[in-house]
């Protein structure tokens, strides 16, 4: 039986009942947060691993032996099988043709973005990005500048911190014609938590 205070709370905030599934998920998959009296708010920066992920990973490691995926012995072939299976899964998830795309693994998002900056053909091109990008995305502009690309920031509008759609449409309508164009924006801003339209 809920306490009188909790019953009063539910009467005042009836929509709270709709969060029961989230509470159950937290209790099952993230009990360590409650055990340590923690609140985790950096989901756009790094997703919290679930208890089921820990258990599955533990099972995988305890039942197998994996070696260097660049060799040809049985343990290395087992690791290669996992890596290649993961590549295939990622491409399938994004409906990306494996004849046209390749999934590359890096140590972290910053490493992946640096790889883009180092390898993208910016010469005579354009790099368009929003003001609320992650700092590593902003770092790509140095590679773009060094190769002679035009770099343009799209502002966010106060108070809701959303991209100025009219300015974005203007900028998207005038691509560089002598080089490649790259537009970078976060699906969800790790500064404001705003979710941007993925259709851009």
Give the positions of each predicted feature.
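Pyridoxal 5′-phosphate
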Residues: 1-200
């Amino acid at each position: 039986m809920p306490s009188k205070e909790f019953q009063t709370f539910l009467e005042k905030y009836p929509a709270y009942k709709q969060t029961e599934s989230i509470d159950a998920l937290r209790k099952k998959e993230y009990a360590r947060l409650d055990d340590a009296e923690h609140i985790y708010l950096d989901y756009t920066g790094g997703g919290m691993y679930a208890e089921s992920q820990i258990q599955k990973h533990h099972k995988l490691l305890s039942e197998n032996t994996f070696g260097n995926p660049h060799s040809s012995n049985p343990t290395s072939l087992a690791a290669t099988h996992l890596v290649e299976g993961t590549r295939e899964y990622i491409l399938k998830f994004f409906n990306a043709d494996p004849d046209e795309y390749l999934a590359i693994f890096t140590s972290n998002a910053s490493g992946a973005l640096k790889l883009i900056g180092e390898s993208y053909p910016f010469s005579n091109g354009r790099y368009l990005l929003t003001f609320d990008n992650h700092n590593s995305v902003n770092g790509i502009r140095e590679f773009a500048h060094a190769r002679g690309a035009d770099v343009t920031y799209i502002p966010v509008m106060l108070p809701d911190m959303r991209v100025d759609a009219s300015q974005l449409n203007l900028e998207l309508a005038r691509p560089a014609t002598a080089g490649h164009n790259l537009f970078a924006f976060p699906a969800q801003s790790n500064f404001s938590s705003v979710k941007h339209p993925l259709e851009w």
